């Protein structure tokens, strides 16, 4: 499915999730993905925030640490800006370190783009390749 420029049209959660499901390379069948997402967003200590046509799901842990994922239906340039806004939001919530995992290596490009001009001082990330072929990002939100 085509991405939708949030500067031209704002989508709702269901529309964003549907587009993200179609465009994500996942082992979960499409018909099972939406119920899984709906279950995930209702878990305790979970924060859901929409920035543009990107929905960020954060599972808050202890000591300012959390695991997050993004459901994106926005254009690439907006996805970068939405992500910058989100990490500032997460920092204001008291988060210090966020972790995410994904299978599509193109997503790591997003983190490299943000690291060139981070929205907060001291912000950085480390990328790890997983045995499964996926990747893990550990994002330090800085000062």
Walk through the language-model features, giving the residues of each:
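Short, surface-exposed beta-strand/loop "edge" segments at domain boundaries and coil↔beta transitions
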Residues: 27, 55-56, 106-109
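Conserved catalytic-core motifs of GNAT/GCN5-like acyltransferases
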Residues: 117-138
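Short amphipathic alpha-helix that is part of the acyltransferase structural core
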Residues: 1-36, 143
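Short, solvent-exposed secondary-structure boundary motifs
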Residues: 34-52, 113-119
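Intrinsic-disorder/low-complexity loop/linker signature
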Residues: 8, 53, 63-64, 123, ...
